[in-house]
């Protein structure tokens, strides 16, 4: 997938990494489904897992492939719209994290990215819309369930 904002990220040597990277996004309402999806990933899978929860105490151990990085996002420790004092709305922390991750990690190249999005309707619809409409991922590369 071509990203004009990443056009300057080329190197003089070829990068032959054609493995699939995974982006997995979930919230506390879908932890059982998240555990099942992570168990189905190949042992050599690589990528990022974002899990949004209400409080830091809601963090639980997850079994993931060795090359997957898990980031827990606590809404209680994040603000809503900057400068308003509003709390972080459900799905907002994960959506922000996905936007930042895609801006940094999705570059033109031989590799493929697949996304698995689980959770509440707002989270799933916003992340799916971002990945397909804004980033340009194929709809078939995004598995979404709310």
Task: List PLM regions with ranges.
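Extended, composition-driven regions rather than compact fold-specific motifs
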Residues: 1-146
